[in-house]
Amino acid sequence: MDTFQLLLAVGVCFWIYFLWSRRRLYMMHFKIPGPMGLPILGIAFEYLITYKRKMSIRTKYMDIYGSTCLVWVGPTPFVITRDPKIAEEIFLSPECLNRSSIFSKPVNSCTGDGLLSLEASKWVDRRKNLNPAFKQNVLLSFLPIFNSEAKTLVAFLDSLVGQGEKKVRDDIVRWSFRIATQTTVGTDVKKDASFKNDSVLKSYETFMKIIVMNVLLPFTHNKIFSTLGGFETQKALAKSNVNKMIGTIVDKKLMTKPESGSQPEITSVINKAIELHRNGEMSREEVQSECCSFVVAAFETTGDTVYHALILLAMFPEHQDTVYQELKELFPVAGDFEVTYDDLQRMVFLERVVNETLRLIPSVPFTPRETIRDFRLSSGVVIPKGVGIGIDIFATHRNRDHWGTDPSSFNPDHFLPDNVRDRHPYAYIPFSKGRRNCIGWKYGLMSSKLALSKILRNCKVSTSFRYEDLEFVDNIGMELAQSPGLEFHRRT
């Protein structure tokens, strides 16, 4: 009995200490409203039992408790917001530069230390060093790749004419992967067997599945669970395949010595990373990790932007007709044509369509950060160091205070110049914003517009799927519960 009483006393003391050490977290909850959820689990149980309806969970709580609220995921508090004013404070604050460890650890375990997952202290210099790889002249040098791969995609879609509705999301993502890989490590990758037979694409898809699982169900990141579940083996095989392909290209470039006195040519991420490696600013492993990270960040997001734009235009043929008329003026003859940068600048309505697509179906629906130090909101509320804080991009883009009484409607006129000027600058944030925005956002818009221009000049798309039946699944990248099929009709 004495032993039991001693253990009980120790347990009570430990519990009191545990609660006391977290007192600032509990006090924060008095100032930021939100649900407590179940003991230990918080609201995590809802993510487990409502897998295909997860996008509605955060929205539900923000509708109840306000545009900024606090939720508990297990024993961990997380502040979420759809308020553009609060989003601006977060994005511009040096205290919120770190990505949440819930996100960064799974990414790092697959791709290594890259811009996607680096902690702020390392990210600042790395971002500054890699910015030249995304300057305008470099992006323009990608146009031949964009045109060539878009031609291949259009030819494939044309082969589907007369076959009824087809599921083409995976085929469009494959196109996106091909351009992401070539613009990251160079066109020599097309000679690699693993690139040609899509095995390296499958490896990247394995990365994405494991990252998503680890983020949504953090306990799966545990090494023991991951090993018993076979995920460590899958991850190791995928990393081996990707590292072999990228490593071969890195080795080849390192063997090519730059001419004495010549300026290094910056035409891709890998070339800039190799230059930094030669200057002693990046290790060889970091070069490889950065290349891997860029492909992970680019291929599904860009592919989904194109796919989502196509399904929305198929659902709203009046807007598709307007796009077609704009493209027909630019390219009177259908078939294969080269799209220039000047052509892209003239696609005014198509750009509005792409922006509206990214508003309604953002490629990344949620941006998680973690406070480096105590962070004070303009309201006076202090969010302690180490607390997760995130912007719900999906909900921000449908905030009635900024998008009107029917924010879920598809209306490209939301992006007419007058409407953009009158709106809060952080009401539309598909590529994040502020200090740690997406380095490749111009790349994403350019490649998406070019591919869409070729597809929509050559094909009319239709679908029997209704807009109101779209269901959105909360994920790292936006996911549809059902991917609508598309039917293609040849234009002349």
Curated annotation (Swiss-Prot):
Signal peptide coordinates: none
Membrane topology: Peripheral membrane protein
UniProt main location, coarse: endoplasmic reticulum
Keyword set, alphabetical order: Endoplasmic reticulum, Heme, Iron, Membrane, Metal-binding, Microsome, Monooxygenase, Oxidoreductase
Binding site for heme: 438
Matches recorded under Gene3D superfamilies: Cytochrome P450
Principal EC category: oxidoreductase
GO molecular function annotation: heme binding; iron ion binding; monooxygenase activity; oxidoreductase activity, acting on paired donors, with incorporation or reduction of molecular oxygen
Membrane listed as a keyword: yes
EC number in record: 1.14.-.-
Annotated family: Belongs to the cytochrome P450 family.
Protein name (Swiss-Prot/TrEMBL): Probable cytochrome P450 313a3
This protein's encoding gene: Cyp313a3
